[in-house]
């Protein structure tokens, strides 16, 4: 039991957030609502779990209301599988052999998960995991992962955090590159960090005449001053 359990390593932060694991049944969400904690949805990595996601949050809300608590979607974490590369074909090449062994030797062979059958080939594994309706993984480009995360937001009605499941489908180098691509291109996009840049660019495009007039006014001011005009001339002819 957990009666005499102790942590061997204490957390670095004094106030540590708690999250209840949730799969397909209402149990995890109900427990989170009862105690007002966050949720870690690991069922999102299976087809049945994905199908259950749209109704999952209501279990937490109902339990929270019953016990006088409040739950916030920002505390809902969704776990996802992915391997990202510059192209879909490259991601496929990098992940297929490791995915094949992971499924056949670990998930089906060691864990013997109910309903999980071994793949017959590496390519079949990639197709079934990432390129069918209800696929549980993203094996592709940063844009593919961005699109899938946005689909998950629509499917669930909104959540707070995406957590990538660390696996060993690809080599250490390619796995590191995958996470680098996620950090560089996926995180800024899904967190809205690029919105201001795009708005600024669009403003410049739509107000080009205003900027041109300002530039002309500056040039007129320079040319009306003999010393300034000479300095500009020298600067423009300098090697």
Residue ranges and their predicted role:
Residues 24, 45-46, 82-84, 168:
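Active-site-proximal loop/turn and secondary-structure-junction residues that shape catalytic pockets
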Residues 18-22, 37-42, 74-81, 162-164:
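Hydrophobic faces of well-ordered beta-strands that scaffold small-molecule active sites
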Residues 176-185:
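C-terminal structured "cap/appendage" subdomains that terminate the fold
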Residues 27-57, 75:
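A conserved active-site cap/scaffold subdomain adjacent to cofactor or substrate pockets
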Residues 1-8, 48-160, 187, 191-239:
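An alpha-helical appendage that flanks or caps ligand/catalytic pockets
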């Amino acid at each position: 039991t957990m009666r005499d359990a102790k942590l061997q390593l204490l957390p670095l932060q004094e106030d540590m957030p708690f999250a209840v694991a949730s799969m397909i049944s209402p149990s995890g969400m109900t427990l989170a609502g009862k105690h007002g904690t966050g949720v870690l949805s690991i069922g999102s990595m299976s087809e049945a779990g994905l199908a259950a996601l749209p109704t999952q949050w209501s279990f937490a809300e109902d339990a929270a209301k019953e016990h006088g608590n409040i739950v916030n979607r920002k505390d809902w974490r969704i776990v996802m599988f992915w391997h990202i590369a510059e192209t879909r074909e490259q991601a496929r090449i990098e992940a297929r052999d490791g995915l094949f062994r992971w499924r056949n030797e670990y998930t089906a062979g060691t864990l013997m998960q109910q309903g999980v059958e071994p793949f017959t080939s590496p390519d079949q594994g990639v197709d079934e995991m990432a390129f069918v309706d209800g696929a549980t993984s993203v094996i592709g480009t940063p844009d593919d992962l961005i699109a899938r995360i946005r689909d998950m937001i629509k499917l669930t009605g909104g959540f707070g955090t995406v957590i990538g499941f660390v696996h060993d489908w690809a080599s250490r180098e390619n796995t590191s590159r995958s996470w680098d691509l996620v950090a560089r291109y996926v995180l800024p996009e899904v967190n809205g960090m690029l919105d201001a840049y795009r708005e600024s660019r669009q403003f410049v495009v739509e107000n080009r005449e205003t900027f041109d007039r300002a530039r002309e006014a500056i040039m007129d001011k320079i040319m009306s001053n003999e010393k300034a005009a000479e300095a500009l001339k020298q600067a423009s002819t300098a090697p």
